[in-house]
Curated annotation (Swiss-Prot):
GO terms for molecular function: cullin family protein binding. It comes from Bos taurus. Residues 196-297 form the BACK domain. Substrate-specific adapter of a BCR (BTB-CUL3-RBX1) E3 ubiquitin-protein ligase complex required for mitotic progression and cytokinesis. The BCR(KLHL9-KLHL13) E3 ubiquitin ligase complex mediates the ubiquitination of AURKB and controls the dynamic behavior of AURKB on mitotic chromosomes and thereby coordinates faithful mitotic progression and completion of cytokinesis. This is Kelch-like protein 13. PROSITE patterns: BTB. Pathway: Protein modification; protein ubiquitination. SUPFAM superfamilies: Kelch motif, POZ domain.
Length: 655
């Protein structure tokens, strides 16, 4: 069927071969030739005021200096000469005939062989056609053969929808790769809602991988609009299954996708054989119970096909156990988003020391912060961790208090699929200035402080039971420490014990419920951050005592090798940051906000460390200065609205 195209103008493609502007028979008069030597010993040949594209360079040898000249127009002259010989029927040594007519095309064997591996093998590989004067090319049409021959002799190709398929078929059969590339560009440039299905069919027929990928991308991006056209029902099973399984599919609810798939299945009876395979790509657990009962269970094959029945049972079980969902994740429960972002949460604002409840993500493409659903209550000095792309916020403080007397025990969980929060079981003890890690599907809250003082205790949260239980405590109480996980165990570094900054490193193994001492850091530090990249555990920033009542930023950084049990220094930070958020994004370390003791103020800076280059860079700023902020990475739906940046405030005195 003919394609509907968004332009009726033919595309003229030219191979990058220079065209000589003068007649081949016109001699170059010495009076008009000038050699211009440049400092780099390259030369240009000029004819009057027009450059002729000649160049030269010097080459030294034992025989003396040799000047080598190059003409950039020679290939064009030769090509024009061969084309003229073809048009005049001179020196042609073979005649090609298309498979659908008796038309004859006299050509030169050497030209065809130089442009096509197919013809090269035919004329030099001992095939019977090698000695034939007339060759019939079955499978190549008259239109296609003419286009191929014209291109070989002129380096130009004129394409429109009337000749595209013939040209594509001939180029594929005869292995004329530049023509195939032109056809790919032509197809991609003209894809619309009306012809995307047919373009995809052509791409599959001729194995045009780039075109097929583009059609997939186009259909994904425009799927909601495609659903309102008749073209949707013409999609082949493979492409529809790909679209339904993709995390890049946006702006469609799972119920809309289910209804559309049912329409596609019911168009033709044989399609019902694909019902179970397609339904595996619908994310039934993300539907509401009402949608499942009113719209899904009423469809006959969803009640009779065993696979479909199991899909409904899976959805029902998932929805009945909301606390367990982070450890029940599968392809059918994942968010339909293909973008992971740096996310920040809470913190205390420099202005009036107000605690924030904002949850934000940084849009790397738009270079701006965007707001997600805020917490019900503000938080700083809290712990955050991610299990199954669910964000947990644990403990911390709702009011500004440097002594931890207003610590809380509440725990909330953010679901990016719905941009909503829910409360889960509270800690056994209120705690702030502590560390939280996610390890093997559990949460571990380590140390900290509250109104009763410093804490050595460690609690473990089990999403399967929605309970916190105590595990082995630390040998000494710690607060302001940092932690990370590697190799199935948790590492805790530094912090403050009995008002003394530490440099120790401890390792907790959840399988044995024991703490093990490791090689200490080279520098004491607290309120720092820690993260894992590859097989290295990085310790960054923080502060320590300068005297009895004052503090200094710690700019030095180092990493720990669990395999060698040793520390190695790395490049120092550009600016001091304590009590920060830290996240690893695309193998780079982002240190977010915090407090600078040297400058006596909260900071809005975000610094990035590249482990491969051992370099620090300031990359962007927070919307406002925030201390006690936390950060992570999360796969989310980027919202449309941006976060406004408030005016800068003057630094406050140190807390």
């Amino acid at each position: 069927m003919p394609l509907k195209w968004k332009t009726s103008s033919p595309a003229i493609w030219k191979f990058p071969v220079p065209v000589l502007k003068t007649s081949r028979s016109t001699p170059l008069s010495p009076a008009y030739i000038s050699l211009v030597e440049e400092e780099d010993q390259h030369m240009k040949l000029s004819l009057g005021s027009s450059e002729m594209g000649l160049s030269s360079h010097l080459q030294s040898s034992k025989a003396g200096t040799t000047r080598i000249f190059t003409s950039n127009t020679h290939s064009s002259v030769v090509l024009q000469g061969f084309d003229q010989l073809r048009l005049e029927g001179l020196l042609c040594d073979v005649t090609l005939m298309p498979g659908d007519t008796d038309d004859a095309f006299p050509v030169h064997r050497v030209m065809m062989a130089s442009a096509s591996d197919y013809f090269k093998a035919m004329f030099t590989g001992g095939m019977k056609e090698q000695d034939l004067m007339c060759i019939k090319l079955h499978g190549v049409s008259k239109v296609g053969l003419r286009k191929i021959i014209d291109f070989i002799y002129t380096a130009k190709l004129s394409l429109n929808m009337d000749n595209l398929q013939d040209t594509l078929e001939a180029a594929s059969f005869l292995q004329i790769l530049p023509v195939l590339d032109f056809c790919k560009v032509f197809l991609i440039s003209g894809v619309t809602l009306d012809n995307c299905v047919e373009v995809g069919r052509i791409a599959n027929t001729y194995n045009l991988t780039e075109v097929d990928k583009y059609v997939n991308s186009f259909v994904l991006k425009n799927f909601p609009a495609l659903l309102s056209t008749g073209e949707f029902l013409k999609l082949p099973f493979e492409r529809l299954a790909f679209v339904l399984s993709s995390n890049s599919l946006k702006h469609c609810t799972e119920l809309e996708l289910f209804k559309a798939t049912c329409r596609w299945l019911r168009l033709e009876e044989p399609r019902m054989d694909f019902a179970a395979k397609l339904m595996k790509n619908i994310r039934f657990p993300l539907m509401t119970p009402q949608e499942l009962i009113n719209y899904v269970q009423t469809v006959d094959f969803m009640r009779t096909d065993n696979t479909c029945v199991n899909l409904l049972l899976e959805a029902s079980n998932y929805q009945m156990m909301p606390y367990m969902q982070p450890v029940m994740q599968s392809d059918r429960t994942a968010i339909r988003s293909d973008t992971t972002h740096l996310v920040t949460l809470g913190g205390v604002l420099r202005q009036q020391l107000v605690v924030s409840k904002e949850l934000r993500m940084y849009d790397e493409k738009a270079h701006e912060w965007k707001s997600l659903a805020p917490m019900d209550a503000p938080r700083y000095q809290h712990g955050i961790a991610v299990i199954g792309n669910f964000l947990y916020v644990v403990g911390g403080q709702s009011n500004y208090d440097t002594k931890g007397k207003t610590a809380v025990d509440t725990v909330f969980r953010f679901d990016p699929r719905y941009n909503k929060w829910m409360q889960v079981a509270s800690l056994n003890e209120k705690r702030t200035f502590f560390h939280l890690s996610a390890l093997k599907g559990y949460l571990y809250a380590v140390g900290g402080r509250n109104a009763a003082g410093e804490l050595p205790t460690v609690e473990c949260y089990n999403p399967r039971t929605n309970e916190w239980t105590y595990v082995a405590k630390m040998s000494e109480p710690h607060y302001g420490h940092a932690g990370t996980v590697y190799g199935g165990v948790m590492y805790i570094s530094g912090g403050i014990t009995h008002d003394t900054f530490q440099k120790e490193l401890m390792c907790f193994d959840p399988d044995t419920d024991k703490w093990i001492q490791k090689a200490p850091m080279t520098t004491v530090r607290g309120l720092h951050c820690m993260c894992t990249v590859g097989e290295r555990l990085y310790v960054i920033g923080g502060n320590h005592f300068r005297g009895t009542s004052d503090y200094d930023d710690v700019l030095s950084c180092e990493y720990y090798s669990p395999i060698l049990d040793q520390w190695t220094p790395i490049a120092a930070m550009l600016r001091g940051q304590s009590d920060v958020g830290v996240a690893v994004f695309e193998n780079k370390i982002y240190v977010v906000g915090g407090y600078s003791w040297n400058n006596r103020c909260m900071v809005e800076i975000v610094q990035k460390y590249d482990p491969d280059k051992d370099e620090w860079h300031k990359v962007f700023d927070l919307p406002e200065s925030l201390g006690g902020i936390r950060a992570c990475t999360l796969t989310v739906f980027p919202p449309e609205e941006t976060t406004p940046s408030p005016s800068r405030e003057s630094p406050l005195s140190a807390p």
